[in-house]
Amino acid sequence: MAASSIAAQIMNRPNAQRLIRSLNHDVIPLVTGIESDRLFDEPFEPFELEMILTDGQLIEIEKGLTVEILATPGHTRDFLCYYIQNKKILIASEAAGCADGTGQIFADFLVDYEDYLAGLKRLAALDVEVLCQGHQFVFVGEAVKNFFARSIESTERFRTMVEELLRIEGGSVERVVARIKAEEYDVKPFPKQPEKAYILNLSARVSYIAQILYERTITRRR
């Protein structure tokens, strides 16, 4: 088992453990078509890491197969991507954004917009033929470049939209979250992210942009 040093710290925090257990527990009733006794419902427990990964580190899996570690904070502070250069495969997960079944790409910066966008552009500059996003889809060939271009545009557009909604709603994060949820989540068909996790993630993104606007306002007043 391997992860970043930040992930190791987070995993040992009681509040993080409680959140992981809660989100895992909430999703079990949403799983259909599988007998309940076949579902793994043991609560999450922290575990020891065998290796700490760092940005730029090269790990030889076997002869001729090396994985490069890329630190891409922004989605979460501990987030890592994995690039197999000789096979042009990138396992980017949420750091690249996530397209759903409708084709919409979600910008997933939960902790830092600028870091997320910088990481996204870093990934887009790599020579990639196979892109593995966090959920549902794998993109290949020319679809990879198209995905990255759309993901960058979606990220920048989301920030602009949230800034405008915050102005309209007088800075209320709760009202902005409710408006966005009504337009992009409530009308979406299944499968989709569990509602609790969606609201948690959306609130984090809107709150971050609200903080940026607040700091900008304070700076102008000085």
Regions found by a protein language model. Give the residues of each.
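Amphipathic, soluble alpha/beta structural segments
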Residues: E50-L53, Q57, T66, V128, ...
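C-terminal regulatory/interaction regions
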Residues: E164-R222
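Active-site HxH/HxHxD metal-binding segment of metal-dependent hydrolases
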Residues: M1-L58
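Charged, amphipathic alpha-helical linkers/stalks
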Residues: I152-G170
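Conserved N-terminal entry element of GNAT/NAT acetyltransferase domains
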Residues: E62-K63
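A general structural signal for short secondary-structure boundary/capping elements
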Residues: E48, H135-V138, R179-E184
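Metallo-beta-lactamase
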Residues: E42, T66-R157
